[in-house]
Amino acid sequence: GNGGNGFSQTTAGVAGGAGGVGSTTGGAGGAGGNAGLLVGAGGAGGAGALGGGATGVGGAGGNGGTAGLLFGAGGAGGAGGFGFGGAGGAGGLGGKAGLIGDGGDGGAGGNGTGAKGGDGGAGGGAILVGNGGNGGNAGSGTPNGSAGTGGAGGLLGKNGMNGLP
């Protein structure tokens, strides 16, 4: 299930739960909860689960939660699941930062043994003081997935790095 949202103005978002293993398609990771209104970090997205069977497809990673408006880092995206006989799951997106804070890193794409690797998730962006999140690495497969792009840095910060192909 999805992580719950932060329940006050100073509370961080709760992480999303991991997806359950599937006989064909793995369960998707839950989204990370958003932080409280003003202050707090976004919750991390849950990991996608393994997809089993001859054509198993990995579950997608959950997206990272958004930080509070003023202070806080974005949540990291969850990793995509392994596709046992099929495609790997996509990595989750990194969450957006507050005015002060770093963007969340994107999740790595899952590997697929019988099909395409999962795409890495894009890093979350920063606004004022903070660096963009790094993009998730691509999953291996036939063909490999696409690497996630780094998030935009704040006015006083650097852009995140792209994931590895």
Predicted features along the sequence, with ranges:
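Glycine-centric low-complexity repeats
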Residues: 1-165
